[in-house]
Amino acid sequence: MKHLLLLTLSALLYCWVSADTRCHSCYKVPVLGCVDRQSCRLEPGHKCLTTNVYLGKMWVFSNLRCGTPEEPCREVFNETNHKLGLNYNTTCCDKDNCNSPAPRPTPALALISLTSLAGLGLWLLH
């Protein structure tokens, strides 16, 4: 009887913890970082995923999202799309926000970058 009670409590605790697991969801691109950043709730039995896409050795973009019954997370390393010449790496994780994107770019950093580019443009015009 003790074992049945312990098993039931463990199952309830697992369902309660996994029901609140969240993943980041966005398309991450160079310079801009995560575009359309959101959060999704992970369904029980599924995992967060991050797919990194490369052209040769150059990173092109990443797709962060929750795995779903229609598109579950399947880890893949160096899968190649021969028509486009792209390589894909997909990793899976099941902790809260484990597929963490890079921090959002700060407005100050963007302002410094734009000011530097404007200064360079003016210098080139002289």
Swiss-Prot record:
Give a Gene Ontology cellular component term annotated to this protein: protein-containing complex
Q: How is it modified after translation?
A: N-glycosylated.
Any one GO MF term held by the record is:
identical protein binding
Record keywords: Cell membrane, Disulfide bond, Glycoprotein, GPI-anchor, Lipoprotein, Membrane, Signal
Q: Which residues form the signal peptide?
A: 1-19
Keyword set includes Disulfide bond = yes
Where in the cell is the protein located?
Cell membrane
| Major localisation | membrane
Q: In which tissues is it expressed?
A: Highly expressed at the leading edges of cells, on filopodia.
Give the membrane topology, semicolon-separated if more than one: Lipid-anchor; GPI-anchor
Task: Report residues carrying sugar chains.
Answer: 89
- Which cysteines in this chain are paired by disulphide bridges? 23-48, 26-34, 40-66, 93-98
Annotated lipid attachment (GPI-anchor amidated serine): 100
> Which CDD domains does the UniProt record give?
TFP_LU_ECD_Ly6G6c
Q: List, for all copies, the residue spans of the domain called UPAR/Ly6.
A: 21-112
Q: What is the designated name of this protein?
A: Lymphocyte antigen 6 complex locus protein G6c
